[in-house]
Every structure is written in structure tokens, then in C-alpha cells.
């Protein structure tokens, strides 16, 4: 049995707003929205991976907070784990740098106004209960 490979996602929060990122690649995911993040590299902690991915994908410096309970299956052998995160003081505002073409800060009332990737829906439900 193959060990799961962890993909980390960020519930990047600003007050009661959640950052959503619209995929531009690959073509089968383009136009759908997700929590920003990426794969944990060998020897890297999940928290360090998430901070690195936010720097690479959005150009921000963020503090990783608590893990959202749950683990969501992606395409095998990947699983999604989500952490809260907040921008550090002095961090630039997020920009869509890699694999994204738009970003939106969503209020609790707007969370379901975007078409989320299927694998992110349950995580967003968990996050919604915390906003």
C-alpha cells in the first residue's frame, strides 16, 4: 500500500474573509476555485510547506495557524490537509503568480458564489463554520 502524499491548503483569513484562488492550469481545473497550497516536499513539515507555497503562489509572507480537522482524498496517492493562515504584518497583498489567474477575498455570505474544486468543498464547509 502506498503512503499518502500530503497536499497542504491554506484557509488564508483576513478578519472574516477567506482567500479563494481561481485555477488557470491545468486545463481540466481552469476556472474552478481552490484554497491555495501545494505538495509537502520530502523532509519538510506541513507548516513549512504551506508557508513556502503561499510565498511561491501568491508572493506573501504568512503565519500558519491551526490545522482544520479532517483529511480529504485527492487523486491517489494524494490527500488534502488544510491549515488556517494569516498574512504577516508588512506582507504584500496576494497576487496570482502560479497556476491562478484571479483571487477573491470571500465573506461568509459569498463562500458559495464561486465554483470550488470538488476536493475543496468539504474543507470549505469546515472553514465556513469558523468564520
Role assignments for model-derived ranges:
Residues 1-18, 39:
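Conserved N-terminal beta-strand and adjoining loop/helix that marks the start
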Residues 10-11, 25, 71-72, 93-97:
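Short secondary-structure boundary/capping segments
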Residues 17-56:
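Conserved Nudix-box catalytic region and its N-terminal flanking loop in Nudix hydrolases
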Residues 55-65:
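A SAM-dependent methyltransferase catalytic signature shared across enzymes that methylate proteins
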Residues 61-62, 70-94, 104-108, 120, ...:
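Active-site-adjacent beta-strand/loop module that shapes the phosphate/pyrophosphate-binding cleft
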Residues 111-112, 124:
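A generic structural signal for short hydrophobic patches within well-formed alpha-helices
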